[in-house]
Amino acid sequence: MSAKQDDTQPIQAASKRLLKVILEGEALTRLSPLQEMDRAQAVADLEAENVFSLERPLPGMTPVSEQGPYVLHLSIQEGRLIFDIRRQDDTFLTVLALALGPFRRLIKDYHLLVDSYVKAVQEAREARIQAIDMGRRGLHNEGAELMRHRLNGKISIDFETARRLFTLVCVLHQRI
């Protein structure tokens, strides 16, 4: 590779990412300590490292004007997951709405696992805690695959970004 190509790669990588994630919604005021911990960790991890970019140009815009880094306002409104995507200066870029239906079973399972985890911690059952952690990892992996599938053709994300976004969807959504 030439030096010129090497110089552009960090710029391209920096433009295909989320700079900031903002969660919106009343559900955030009623989080359990474990859900709050999941939320804080997912947001911190997302802001530190992620892959996120629009896959196709928006009408009337050039691909260069749509490059990130992006600010993501994530919320749930009227049964839909809302990706309000903005430029680095927080000016509006686009909104993507996904139906929550395909996520419902996984969200319900997430809340059941959170309840089971809290109970296992209270009872100091180490083997149970480890089993629940394994289940949570599997659930998050399944949620990540579904997230990537649902965003396919719209937003390009890697597996770890999808996993963290799935965590935030679960935190935003009240019990089903």
UniProtKB/Swiss-Prot annotation:
Cross-referenced InterPro entries: UCP032146
Pfam families, per the entry: UPF0262 (PF06793)
Transmembrane segments: none
Family the entry assigns: Belongs to the UPF0262 family.
Protein name: UPF0262 protein GbCGDNIH1_1393
Organism expressing this protein natively: Granulibacter bethesdensis (strain ATCC BAA-1260 / CGDNIH1)
Lineage: Bacteria, Pseudomonadati, Pseudomonadota, Alphaproteobacteria, Acetobacterales
